[in-house]
Amino acid sequence: MKIIGIIAEYNPFHNGHLYQIEKVKEIYPESIIIVAMSGNFLQRGEPAIVDKWVRAKQALLNGVDVVVEIPIAGCVQPADRFAENGVRILNNMGCEELFFGAEHAEYDFMTYAQLVQNLDSTEFSKKNISYAEAFQEAVAAKIGHNIDSPNDVLGLAYAKANLKFGKKLKLNPISRNVAGYHDKSLSPDSNIASATAIRKVLFSKDHNLVDKYLPSYQDLKDEKYISWDDFWPFLRYKLISSDIDELANIYGMAEGIQYRMKKKALELKVEATFDEWLKAVKSKRFTYTRLTRLSVATLVGMKVNDVSLYNKFPYVHLLGFTKNGQKALNIMKKNSEIPLLAKISQQDKDDFYHVDYRAGKIYQSQNYKEQDLKRAPLIF
């Protein structure tokens, strides 16, 4: 029994994701597939278009055997930390191989990881460019070419994490089929489109265009689609009503950015949108993605201590499984060092799960569905 791991967001689950799962089954027909998935807020600091339960259901109905949630403190992170938290979870769940999409599947990501493992990240802050740009420059100098496509960047991050944890996973990059990560339009000649293009159409309400790109559209068509527009009034209130010292304790705050975030929230016209606020706050050092992650941390009140605690005492939330997946869960219970939460209790929500619970309640304010407390895993 081969246990395969995937780290994903499924925002939403589309035919490109299905293609990846089918490739796994083609290579390992009897495998068990475990997915470590982002929750209601995603790695790049965006709210998921539909909640984690809908996305987990879509995965389980399309070939995945177990879906677990990467807690928000491990998920809303730069690529390296996101990858590290995902790989740590999959290692502890007994996965032997990691499959992931890549723009350049021919790259030897593990060799690249060995070449860049000793980069001095403290030097990056001395340059008048973003951390991501400084990192890209340093990587290119080590390996001889740029790695700047989104999934290649994640592939390198997975390899670095795998190196850190003793190379327990075999890495299997799969070429992205047709659509690029940030492609904004649907191709009429293919049934695969980027999640970016699909979300754009779903938000436009022109849903008849998107059906062929989604294997589980019926699960999506009656959902309310969530975006930053839904949470901007809450974030703006938080920025205006919080004092500077309080904001300074939010995870990711640095270089006094809290002053600028608060100032622009106060100064912009009443009808200003989240995107307009982002443009007003953005600088060379603070990219849009860095600011959206900061925005999530501010919205849910995720502090430096919360992330430190998660790093020391990680946990994972079980969202759903199939009968086949139950076998992998039985193995994990015997061998894992990370607690697996099947149902969130009152004690959990008041203890280590409090940030995830708060994030769920904030998301629930817009989709009106209980996200955590006493909610049982999906079983198929």
Curated annotation (Swiss-Prot):
Function: Catalyzes the formation of N(4)-acetylcytidine (ac(4)C) at the wobble position of elongator tRNA(Met), using acetate and ATP as substrates. First activates an acetate ion to form acetyladenylate (Ac-AMP) and then transfers the acetyl group to tRNA to form ac(4)C34.
Keyword list, A-Z: ATP-binding, Cytoplasm, Ligase, Nucleotide-binding, RNA-binding, tRNA processing, tRNA-binding
Reactions catalysed according to its record: cytidine(34) in elongator tRNA(Met) + acetate + ATP = N(4)-acetylcytidine(34) in elongator tRNA(Met) + AMP + diphosphate
UniProt binding sites for ATP: 7-20, 101, 151, 176
Entry protein name: tRNA(Met) cytidine acetate ligase
Predominant localisation class: cytoplasm
GO cellular component: cytoplasm
Native organism: Ligilactobacillus salivarius (strain UCC118)
Domain of life the protein comes from: Bacteria
The EC number(s) this enzyme carries: 6.3.4.-
Homology family: Belongs to the TmcAL family.
GO BP term, pick one: tRNA modification
Keyword tRNA-binding part of the UniProt annotation: yes
PANTHER family found in the cross-reference section: TRNA(MET) CYTIDINE ACETATE LIGASE
Segments passing through the bilayer: none
Localization per Swiss-Prot or TrEMBL: Cytoplasm
Pfam families: HIGH_NTase1
MF GO annotations: ATP binding; ligase activity, forming carbon-nitrogen bonds; tRNA binding
Lineage: Bacteria, Bacillati, Bacillota, Bacilli, Lactobacillales
